[in-house]
Amino acid sequence: MDISSFLLPQLLRKYQQDVYNIASKQNTLLVMRTGAGKTLLAVKLIKQKLEEQILIQESNLEHKKISVFLVNKVPLVFQQAEYIRSQLPAKVGMFYGELSIEMSEQLLTNIILKYNVIVITADLFYLFLARGFLSINDLNLIIFDECHHAIGNDAYARIMNDFYHRAKAVLSKKHFTLPRIFGMTASPFTGKKGNLYHRLYQWEQLFDSKAHVVSENELADYFCLPEESYVMYSNKLVVPPSDSIIKKCEETLQGCKLISRAVKTALAETIDMGLWFGEQVWLYLVDFVETKRLKKKALGKQLSDDEELAIDRLKIFVEDWKNNKYSDNGPRIPVFDSTDVTDKVFKLLELLKATYRKSDSVRTVIFVERKATAFTLSLFMKTLNLPNIRAHSFIGHGPSDQGEFSMTFRRQKDTLHKFKTGKYNVLIATAVAEEGIDVPSCNLVIRFNICRTVTQYVQSRGRARAMASKFLIFLNTEELLIHERILHEEKNLKFALSELSNSNIFDSLVCEERERVTDDIVYEVGETGALLTGLYAVSLLYNFCNTLSRDVYTRYYPTFTAQPCLSGWYCFEVELPKACKVPAAQGSPAKSIRKAKQNAAFIMCLDLIRMGLIDKHLKPLDFRRKIADLETLEEDELKDEGYIETYERYVPKSWMKVPEDITRCFVSLLYTDANEGDNHIFHPLVFVQAHSFPKIDSFILNSTVGPRVKIVLETIEDSFKIDSHLLELLKKSTRYLLQFGLSTSLEQQIPTPYWLAPLNLSCTDYRFLENLIDVDTIQNFFKLPEPVQNVTDLQSDTVLLVNPQSIYEQYAFEGFVNSEFMIPAKKKDKAPSALCKKLPLRLNYSLWGNRAKSIPKSQQVRSFYINDLYILPVSRHLKNSALLIPSILYHIENLLVASSFIEHFRLDCKIDTACQALTSAESQLNFDYDRLEFYGDCFLKLGASITVFLKFPDTQEYQLHFNRKKIISNCNLYKVAIDCELPKYALSTPLEIRHWCPYGFQKSTSDKCRYAVLQKLSVKRIADMVEASIGACLLDSGLDSALKICKSLSVGLLDISNWDEWNNYFDLNTYADSLRNVQFPYSSYIEETIGYSFKNKKLLHLAFIHPSMMSQQGIYENYQQLEFLGDAVLDYIIVQYLYKKYPNATSGELTDYKSFYVCNKSLSYIGFVLNLHKYIQHESAAMCDAIFEYQELIEAFRETASENPWFWFEIDSPKFISDTLEAMICAIFLDSGFSLQSLQFVLPLFLNSLGDATHTKAKGDIEHKVYQLLKDQGCEDFGTKCVIEEVKSSHKTLLNTELHLTKYYGFSFFRHGNIVAYGKSRKVANAKYIMKQRLLKLLEDKSNLLLYSCNCKFSKKKPSDEQIKGDGKVKSLT
């Protein structure tokens, strides 16, 4: 393949061709001014490697390699990738940002296969190499854009040192070629000439390259420097007045972390630009924090108190100020005085007015230092609506150090495009546009803020590329000195580069060996090539600590402790949090503290790799992520419940095995109990089987006509003798009754081991089969229909035919048309007329739910002359029974499948319960596995929790969750079901009466009407069968039976069949042995409260140790593992109660009821009732505040319990209280030898404290209801506000008096300047809840304080804070 024709026709200039000839043959560092075509040369080199790769692949000489274009800014990824795509037919990949955190091995493996070139940020590429997803051997070219950044620990330097030079050292051993290196820069260094020589030499060593400098003389014929001049402005700075919005906010909100940076930003803008600019910052930040709040709430995240405070206070300040100074049309017009607008801004404005007075074709870039400056300058020009000026800001995407101004990558790209096309002609940019970004050629470049380095100066000046362009620098007298220093350094740089151009001065330099800034200690993972260094090890340890189980009150991080060492040397020991249970590691000595810490971190990472806690790609084993991956996999496999697979149905052995010479048989009598009128009298049937029949209870049938029918099977224990004559008679009877009930002809394909016959109602001797069978009726089956001779022939149970050839069009006699025709007729024209109702061809008695609600077709009633009618020698009662037969056989078959299922897996459950467990909703019966699946799921969670708790006793909580998830996940249950061939027992096929056919028969009318041997099942349905089967055994036979089926199915629990066998895997006496020397003084109080005495007191102590206590000496464990198991135990106790309490509740309803009892708020309240919060061992001041806050709210709202019995359900509760309760329940469970009986106190405690879950009513959001109600009344002057009250308190000690400042949040609802409802608390959420409860009380009482009529439809102005009057407890912020 020749790709040369694809390259856009860009002829290289002479200097470019010279560079290309060199760079195509050797590693090269190119130093050339901005805009001279460095990127074009890089693309030419990529094209060369692409052509070589094509030839190599065609010859099958080497595996595929790719080219890498490295950049140091994300916008450059988009820019360079787009340019390469426009020039080459290569497949170009873009990689940037945080993709590395969750980068999968599969994705990165596909890079080589999918792309020819990748454009990637340097830091991310380093991680690709460090984690072994790519290697130097996979590359043929590495391009370093702006390579002058390769200093110190920069990613460029680390890539070369850690991977390129390491690969070069073993090049001869591994037999591979190194990639070509091409570095590009316009500003290699700042400072003295000697320093430049030294730095270039170091770069040559680092990049294994030769530097090539293109001097300005070589470029003189192609480029000209812009005209450079200065604009001097006054040094006078603006001091914000004391009554300004910025000063007031600075004084009042100085403690709010959220806006501390905003204060700095606004003040900086005010001082440098003017008061108007500072005001715009505040307006922007108010919108920002409100957007941040809404986003957090949309994601279900809780706002911190500081964030809530900042939002509410800022809104109050700025809203009032905005109402006074702003119109509805936008920002106020700035005043051109020395306060509102500084001299610097004024001179910029005058300059732009002069430039754009006559034309808008000039392109201008204004470089500023701060993002906020770019934002406000752009807004300033738009507010003034200057003619011919279309300004827009261009800033970076990352968070600012001083404010939350940012621009997404897409907006950056869009802004540049609009600047290129002329929609914008003034671009106000930060440093993001100085270097590398392809800003179009500009006529005017303005440095609004001074350059701090030569690089900044050269790069920004390089943006002025148009002919006759200008470069203006704004300076005051102090900045002029700085600029002169920059010019001097730039002069040295130009002189040095001129000397270096086309010279070999490097060869004469004596320089130290290549600078190495990375570690000498490294570890390479042989399987992946991932490389661990000391520098990477430190961040890896912090990442590992972030994966540990913790709550908001606990933070984990590695601890470095200095160890004794020789003078001038340092040595450190690193210790991970005790929750890891990993021993400390000591590093080798080093001459710097930083290097010594890296050595210790390196040794610890090696230990973690050996333990399997860091994987082969140097990624910490994050069980939270592994759980999420499992859930994602499960969701991907199960998300489409419409995805189904076909499985063979199990056919009962009783249906298939037919003895060759049958002499004995078994009999069941089929009765019904629906006898509402003659229409629903059913003739009893004899059900004869070749095999003994399992005991089956009665079952209910239902259809769209008539009442429900209860089928009773009376099985006779003794077998009966049968001969060939009687057997032949039964076969004929069976076929006739089936045809009679289905109204179609049947052909028997294979013999069946069951037969049907009408019961002899006059039989008194049940010892012989021939006595039970109504032989006379069977013989009548085969008689021809006889015409009606007389009206006396017509009876209520007579089945009539109009056409003797159409035996399935049957009618029932209903009466005569006129009573005068009750005498015999001698002539046809005088024959009486009979009213006849057409009988159904077939009936489905397995209709439930929506199918049973369908309106049946009305039975047609017609009149016939009796002489035209024929009598079928079968009673209408038998016809009714025949219509039942398909549904009876359908149900019996399902029960036989369930019986075989029980027999195969040796289960201890009833047949009807097993049948329910195997029946899905698709069968459309009056029962399915829904409830049993819920029941079994709860037991499986308990069993899996105990299993992983016992198998992994020293692992963190996340790992327990992960290992449990592997057992209880639907993916695992699906695999279990497939391995056990469980799908064949599924009962998911509904009875479709039109197409149903009994086993062994086929309808003569259609080949499609055969016995169904296949069924379609979804993956989720199959997984649910496992849990439903467990639930069936648990329901009928208890815990041991449930364990046995788990063992039979091999779901992953420990190999036990008896509940007491859990104790074989648990040593009560040695558990929590690390606490043997730690005292817990509250044991007796807790035992007295719960009424249980512990054998192992350490278990009880462990249940009350919060993770924050693990910083204490002698504490090496916490309650997290106990809380994990206690959660499952408590779930099971509650579900046991709910399942039996509400037998008609669906699984969804049961889940809601369970959530009411076991949610965090309910459990925290129970823990509070038991006073558990008083005994929690912790080291967190925040936890003390949370406990105090929670206790205050509970005690306050207990007084209003009659109005809202479930008040605690609305309070934001501390999770550690609920965790402690679950841990304590687990401690009792373990201490009692896994006995659920020991927890009998739990259920009464929950029911008495929480009440009945079914009585709770969701009242909706009260605030929303009130808002809507007042809006409907036409009121416009209402709303909510949050204020803060700081209460000072003192505490006397022996030495002095300590002052404390406590913050309280006040949430108020106001109407027309008056506070209607008010809530006060230490937490914003709880203050709002209190306010809502008082608002609800007013609404329920229909209080005039809330609901009075008003006339404010024409008044839109809201009251100020001064107008809102409280009760003296709340002060307005203003």
Swiss-Prot record:
Residue ranges annotated for the RNase III domain, each copy included: 916-1038, 1083-1233
Entry note about domains: The C-terminal dsRNA-binding fold contains a bound zinc ion and is important for normal nuclear retention and function in RNAi-dependent heterochromatin assembly. It binds double-stranded DNA and RNA (in vitro).
One of the GO BP terms on file: termination of RNA polymerase I transcription
Motif (DECH box) on chain: 145-148
Organism: Schizosaccharomyces pombe (strain 972 / ATCC 24843) (Fission yeast)
Keyword Cytoplasm annotated: yes
Name under which the protein is recorded: Protein Dicer
MF GO annotations: ATP binding; double-stranded DNA binding; double-stranded RNA binding; euchromatin binding; helicase activity; ribonuclease III activity; RNA binding; zinc ion binding
Region listing for C-terminal dsRNA-binding fold, in residue ranges: 1263-1355
General function of this protein: Required for G1 arrest and mating in response to nitrogen starvation. Ago1 regulation of cytokinesis and cell cycle checkpoints occurs downstream of dcr1. Required, indirectly, for regulated hyperphosphorylation of cdc2. Has a role in the RNA interference (RNAi) pathway which is important for heterochromatin formation, accurate chromosome segregation, centromere cohesion and telomere function during mitosis and meiosis. Digests double-stranded RNA (dsRNA) producing 21 to 23 bp dsRNAs, so-called interfering RNAs (siRNA). Required for both post-transcriptional and transcriptional gene silencing. Required for silencing at the centromeres and for initiation of transcriptionally silent heterochromatin at the mating type locus. Promotes histone H3 'Lys-10' methylation necessary for centromere function.
Domain Helicase ATP-binding: 19-206
